[in-house]
Amino acid sequence: TDALCDSIPIVVITGQVPTHLIGNDAFQECDTVGITRPCTKHNYLVKNIDDLPRVLHEAFHIAASGRPGPVVVDIPKDIQFAKGSYSRPNEFPHRGYKPKLDGDPNRIRQAVELMARAKRPLFYTGGGVVNSGPKACALLRELVKLTGFPITSTLMGLGAYQASDPQWLGMLGMHGTWEANW
């Protein structure tokens, strides 16, 4: 759960009973996919050795792209011991994973209207800005300058906005500044 909440890209490889025993309440069987679904970005149960190279490449891609997060790859015992051939996939498009990268103009307009009506506006930023790269940090600086709103950040967002700027209140939280937490 921490890795998902903190946007930590991690691939976790777990073991499972042999494929023919899955769903039979076998000794040491665990519904890893079901248990980890709420706290992972994506998860896999590999039932064919030939799928393993593609699944591993997809898992690392999904863990590190978009909003980073944990991905679980559950490998049954018979697949762990199976022999297969490895060939790097040319492409590994994941049909079910397509993060939306463009902003929705209507939602942006609504956000601007809310900001204009706010009585005590404040930018509360986090690690998503840092993970989005230098362009996002530059756009954040431009937005703060344009609006004149004060800005604060979580621990994971430190560095996205310069601490020497007069609009900067400091970091939020238990170890943050009094101003940011007020």
Residue ranges of model-derived segments:
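N-terminal alpha/beta PP-like core and its mobile active-site loop of ThDP/TPP-dependent enzymes
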Residues: T1-W182
